[in-house]
Regions:
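Glycine-/small-residue-rich active-site loops that bind phosphorylated ligands and cofactors
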Residues: 73, 88, 105-106, 136
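Conserved acetyl-CoA-binding loop-helix of GNAT-fold acetyltransferases
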Residues: 97-100, 106-123, 141-146
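Conserved GNAT acetyl-CoA-binding A-motif
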Residues: 121-132
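Conserved catalytic-core motifs of GNAT/GCN5-like acyltransferases
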Residues: 132, 145-163
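Short aromatic/hydrophobic contact patches that present stacked aromatics
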Residues: 2, 97, 130-132
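Conserved beta-strand-loop-alpha-helix junction that forms the acyl-donor binding cleft
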Residues: 131-141
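GNAT-family acyltransferases
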Residues: 1-95, 156-166
Length: 166
């Protein structure tokens, strides 16, 4: 599995994955789009701007949009790396949000995606990453713990874990 920035050549694979998330009415943490008004090329440009901190909503922070793929180029999931924390992210969202497409869950992809996402965080000088999950999401909790997460506390149904990035 590889985690990387999406490109134009990934359009079909990513659109198909997005359609699965929508069809299954599944949360897509780590991947942001408006299904009613989506243009892939604009999404790519918005991702580039968000990484540079340009033209983002006032309450957002610069972030890197990444997508995980298998060796054949099949899109597996999303990961969003926030380059700093604001008050909301410190309470609820953390540095990293991620999701694996419904048909590929339970196969270890989330664990590997978070591992690779933490390496990108390290490249961006984030040496201690906050990763959160709902108290109702034992699968995500297991992913975070498998990547070295240390529980700090639980706030309003959100478990907050810190991971030392090595």
């Amino acid at each position: 599995m590889i985690l990387r920035r999406p490109s134009q050549t990934d359009k079909e694979a990513i659109l198909e994955m997005m359609a699965e998330f929508e069809r299954e009415q599944s949360a897509h943490d780590g991947g942001f789009w408006n299904p009613d008004n989506f243009v892939y090329e604009e999404w790519l440009e918005e991702n580039l701007q968000a990484e540079a901190g340009l033209n983002i909503p006032e309450n957002w922070v610069p972030a890197i949009q990444l997508v995980s793929f298998d060796e054949a180029g099949y899109a597996l999931g999303f990961l969003n790396l926030r380059l700093r924390l604001n008050d909301y992210l410190l309470e609820k969202g953390g540095h990293i949000g991620y999701s694996i497409r419904p048909s590929e869950r339970g196969k270890g992809y989330a664990k590997e995606a978070l591992h690779q996402g933490l390496q990108v965080a390290k490249e961006k000088n984030i040496h201690r990453a906050l990763v959160t999950c709902s108290t109702e999401n034992p699968a995500s909790r297991a992913v975070i713990l498998a990547n070295g997460g240390q529980l700090e506390d639980v706030r309003n149904g959100t478990e907050r874990y810190w991971i030392e990035v090595e």
